[in-house]
């Protein structure tokens, strides 16, 4: 798979951007803050409907604009599809495939597939469980878009259930002693049923994915850090997952067991939103025990496994390397260069030439600069000219 055409309007620092891209390696070089990452962020957004840098869409819309637009034409084994996205910071986003308006942007999932390496990946190892859950859920959504809808529905039910636990806390505490308490408990029962049904599907999908990653991640890590302790992964849940066929029933049982604690605390304590992808080195958790180099190796291993898994499904995802070479030693750089050499399309950003491995063989190269205008600083792009000064 590769992106042939990219058209962006009012996305971050780009009032407009039109690019014709080719298979192979494309470089975007420019100083930090000039907007090169915004280009690959736009492509990544079409793949995941979210940014790897921010949690909400508002920062994606250029200051002073009402919305942002992204159009990306993906070519996959000779078949062309154009994904169109209208990003609205204060309303529901809209999406099209070619000329067909979609009911939900989620219907775009799978049209563009990317695997992105970035400095933010360190949070997969060092950060909170939410980052690791998102890692799993993004892969699941890319491979099985229907399950993205299940996860979205779960999040909605979870939000409603938490709102009930907080707003109706006095009634819930009184229980069946009065009509308000009985009504609140009946409503909570409804949310429990929905949460368990949807949550079981999310957990089962994650467990199936972890089973596939269980060999891929340690193998990738061993290739990067052969002298380190062996890597191992597992899935930790708030629910007994020993019998996958009865996860829904186990969720209901656990919700009943913890109901009083949930009422007291005003939050939902059971479900996949509390789970974690456990990353170990030897017998120790990687978080807190891995060195800086081991942390980078583990983060890269997670992305390598993701890339290989999507490739096994029959499609080479677009490989995005966003400002990562500057952070890596020679061995890890070489591993990524070998991966890049075998991918159908690779998009690389770097601040300066010195950050790039010498054995990269780009097909195209662009220089990203900025210009100050009455509406603020905007990004501009031009094909690289040998001998030019990229800092001008």
From Swiss-Prot:
HAMAP family per record: RecF (MF_00365)
GO cellular component annotations of the record: cytoplasm
Compartment(s) where it occurs, according to its Swiss-Prot or TrEMBL record: Cytoplasm
Pfam family, one: SMC_N
Source species: Corynebacterium aurimucosum (strain ATCC 700975 / DSM 44827 / CIP 107346 / CN-1)
Protein family according to the UniProt entry: Belongs to the RecF family.
Keywords on record: ATP-binding, Cytoplasm, DNA damage, DNA repair, DNA replication, DNA-binding, Nucleotide-binding, SOS response
Binding-site list for ATP: 30-37
Keyword RNA-binding: no
Broad class of where this protein is predominantly found: cytoplasm
Name of protein: DNA replication and repair protein RecF
PROSITE patterns: RECF_1, RECF_2
GO term, biological process aspect, one: SOS response
InterPro entries: DNA-binding_RecF, DNA-binding_RecF_CS, P-loop_NTPase, RecF/RecN/SMC_N, RecF_2
Function: The RecF protein is involved in DNA metabolism; it is required for DNA replication and normal SOS inducibility. RecF binds preferentially to single-stranded, linear DNA. It also seems to bind ATP.
